[in-house]
């Protein structure tokens, strides 16, 4: 596992170096010359990191906030109303879109851990996403579907609900293209298998073709404080509890279910990628691949971004003019309130709420939320 992690982390790091080097038009070695090289460079500048960045062309100039404001005001003018240089927040900026007439390409998002039931904030709801895909399938104006996946996986059951609906869309004659974001692993890849075509970013983390199950028990923790439980039941399976070790029969049943799910997973991938379960098993077993490696292993069709995926969907659907039709949940009352705020205000809200807490509590709250979000993903039946 350590070797596998080192491999993909190394590839992501190299992709980062190459991207920065290309944009700054300098050698990758200049972006990061290694720990010793960086130390030598900082020694020459007397520890001045800003000067080091300038001399190595990592930045174009050094300036204070006041100097930057003065330059931007000179370039764009001053707004007396906003008391700032004329600008618009990135969050408030709206792209000009064509009129929503004629043929369309449906866009469905799968962002977050995949869970059973309805969608919740930050997670993918199996039923919700499947319903969105169904709506796109039944709309005669929608000529193709793009599924944007940015998910680490989650529930097998929910993943299958989404996969089945996507397969139905393809069977109905609508081309399906998957656009992989930063991550499309495990269940994120499961839901991608029905696609006619898969586009990944070179740095996408995908694969992780495998299944595991977790049942938390605390009998050892209770034992350490002298707490024990007992009882009677008609079967070892009738009274499974977190206060006692999982019965051997239940452990074996769980293992059989996991093994069956894994066979199902590699068979789905094999059928989708025109391979065999045996060949897929060699690159599966939970291994994580970057987009580049996934392309080499035949798990994706090409490297690119969302726009490339949309262009491919239009090509497969043989449409020359189209607009994008986004399928999202109906907004709640809270969503509508948030929509009435400026984008920049919405962006600051999470930090504002956290700022209300004392520093130690804010740190703990952030950690607890992160860990609870992980546990929340384990909601398979």
Q: Residue locations for each model-derived region?
A:
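Gly/Pro- and small hydrophobic-enriched strand-loop and loop-to-helix capping segments
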Residues: 59-69, 195-210, 300-310
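Catalytic-center loop of serine/cysteine hydrolases
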Residues: 1-23, 172, 185, 195-272, ...
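Cleft-lining beta-strand/loop regions that shape enzyme active-site pockets
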Residues: 20, 97-221
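Intrinsically disordered, low-complexity segments enriched in small/flexible residues
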Residues: 1-50, 54-137, 141-144, 233-234, ...
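Terminal peptide-recognition signature
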Residues: 5, 53, 108, 147, ...
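Active-site-proximal glycine-rich helix-loop-beta segment
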Residues: 49-58, 188-197, 297-299
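Long hydrophobic segments that form regular secondary structure
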Residues: 137-142, 263-277, 287, 291-295
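Hydrophobic, secondary-structure "cap" segments at the distal end of domains
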Residues: 24-32, 269-280
């Amino acid at each position: 596992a350590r070797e596998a992690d080192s491999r993909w982390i190394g590839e992501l790091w190299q992709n980062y170096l190459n991207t920065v080097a290309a944009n700054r038009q300098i050698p990758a070695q200049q972006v990061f010359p290694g720990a010793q090289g960086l130390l030598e460079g900082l020694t020459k500048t007397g520890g001045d990191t800003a000067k080091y960045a300038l001399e190595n062309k990592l930045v174009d100039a050094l300036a204070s906030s006041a100097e930057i404001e003065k330059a931007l005001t000179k370039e764009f003018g001053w707004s007396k109303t906003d008391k700032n240089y004329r600008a618009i927040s990135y969050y408030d900026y709206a792209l000009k879109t064509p009129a929503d007439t004629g043929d369309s390409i449906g866009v469905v998002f799968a962002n977050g851990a995949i869970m059973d039931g309805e969608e919740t904030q930050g997670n993918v709801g199996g039923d919700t996403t499947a319903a969105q895909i169904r709506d796109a399938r039944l709309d005669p104006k929608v000529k193709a579907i793009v599924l944007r996946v940015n998910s680490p996986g989650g529930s097998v059951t929910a993943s299958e609900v989404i996969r089945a609906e996507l397969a139905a869309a393809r069977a109905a004659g609508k081309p399906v293209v998957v656009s992989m974001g930063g991550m499309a692993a495990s269940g994120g890849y499961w839901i991608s298998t029905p696609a006619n075509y898969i586009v990944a970013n070179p740095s996408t983390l995908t694969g992780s073709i495998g299944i595991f199950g977790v049942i938390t028990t605390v009998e050892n923790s209770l034992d350490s404080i002298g707490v024990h439980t007992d009882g009677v039941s008609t079967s070892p399976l009738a009274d499974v509890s977190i206060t006692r070790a999982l019965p051997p029969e239940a452990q074996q049943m769980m293992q059989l279910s996991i093994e069956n799910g894994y066979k199902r997973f590699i068979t789905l991938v094999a059928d989708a990628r025109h391979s065999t379960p045996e060949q897929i098993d060699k690159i599966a077993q939970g291994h994580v691949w970057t987009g580049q490696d996934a392309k080499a292993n035949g798990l994706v069709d090409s490297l690119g971004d969302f726009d490339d995926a949309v262009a491919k969907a239009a090509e497969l659907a043989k449409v020359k003019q189209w607009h994008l039709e986004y399928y999202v949940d109906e907004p709640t009352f809270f969503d509508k309130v948030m929509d009435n705020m400026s984008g920049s205000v919405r962006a600051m809200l999470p930090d504002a709420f956290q700022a209300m807490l004392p520093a130690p509590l804010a740190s703990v709250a952030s950690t607890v939320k992160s860990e609870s979000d992980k546990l929340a993903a384990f909601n398979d039946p």
